[in-house]
Amino acid sequence: KVVVRIAEWAPGSKSPVGELVERLGMAGNNDTEMHSILAEYELPYRFEPEIEEAAQAIDARVTAKEIAQRRDFRGVTTFTVDPADAKDFDDALSVRKIKDGVWEVGVHIADVTHYVRPHSVIDDEAVERGTSVYLVDRTVPMLPERLSNELCSLRPHETSLCFSAVFTLNENLDILEEWFGRTVIHSDRLSLIHISEPT
């Protein structure tokens, strides 16, 4: 299978003139068929070298100054829930009891804005892609793997920077208070299989 581009189609001609863009591989091969699906729907399955280089150049350090500017949830029970084979953990939940009948629930999303500046090459590419695409056997990420699987992945027992929505609830699940802002967390990992097992 190949990807071709129509280069010219003369008026009155039954057939266009095309040019070879890329060889995908032998029909029937799993990688070939997956790449064929992505090509058919114009979904990019690799990043340009300049984007990968920009991702590698990002400073991974989380400084004490940065942590001091955030609400600290590192001592609160926090966990991700994803498939067992997941590599990108981009959201987590936290739960703690405030007092009898009152609970705090936090929804934590990886704070990509800490690492990706507006209108940078990575930001522009993410805007172009719009979302990560999940196929049966692979993920086509919105961000380079350096970000999606490392810097912006809420990996277990690591300091992670997040943007969070935090709600205080009563036993009837009425929202008593709400807060939105930047946080820092330590999360544990649960899998979908783990939480589905009977106790």
Give the residues covered by each predicted segment.
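Charge-lined substrate channels and their catalytic hotspots, especially those that engage the 3′ end
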Residues: 1-106, 113-158, 190
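Short acidic-glycine loop/turn motifs at beta-strand connectors
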Residues: 97-99, 169-174
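Short, solvent-exposed aromatic-acidic interface loops
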Residues: 180-189
